[in-house]
Amino acid sequence: LAWMKYAYTNYYNMTPKLGQAIVLAGPMGKGKTLFIKKVLGGLFGKEPSDAGNHMVDGTPWTDYVVDSPIMAIDDQEALTSAQQLAKFSAMLKKYVSSEMINYNAKFKQTGQVPWFGRVVIACNTDSESLRILPNMDISNAKKISLFRTSDHRMQFPARETTERLITAELPFLA
């Protein structure tokens, strides 16, 4: 919760600051995507952008990514080579530690824009899914927090009920 409070408080006070990326790893059905889309999206006032196409697949377009304060990489296909992992890890490090991000949209002028958002990665805990984890060398270790969900099976209410509960309770979390 400290990660979220730090990001939200600075965002709310219009004093943006850089912060850590987080990785949420756990079995299917634990609410990782729900947390990213509904809790973080609700707190920050905008649904997280799907950064997988840009950060993992390598598409150059970032206009949709910088449009949201949260970049989400959710159950993305695993990285298949050491070179891809190194590139992904370097990009993640850059987005976490730099105040500027390249802006690139089709048929528009490119440039750099300020971005103080957060990167959130969600993955399952099978060996294939965990291949999305960035390198945790010395330069990245302080920039990324890793969290693992419990293996306890959770029974969520119906989707509409869950979303209604989150909408009702979210103001008290903020």
Regions found by a protein language model. Give the residues of each.
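Signature of the SF2 helicase/ATPase Hel1-core->accessory helical subdomain module
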Residues: 90-100, 119-120, 125-127, 134
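Alpha-helical scaffold elements adjacent to nucleotide-binding pockets in ATP/GTP-utilizing enzyme cores
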Residues: 35-39, 87-95, 139-143
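A short beta-strand-to-loop transition that corresponds to the Sensor-1 phosphate-sensing loop
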Residues: 75-76, 105-108, 116-127, 148-152
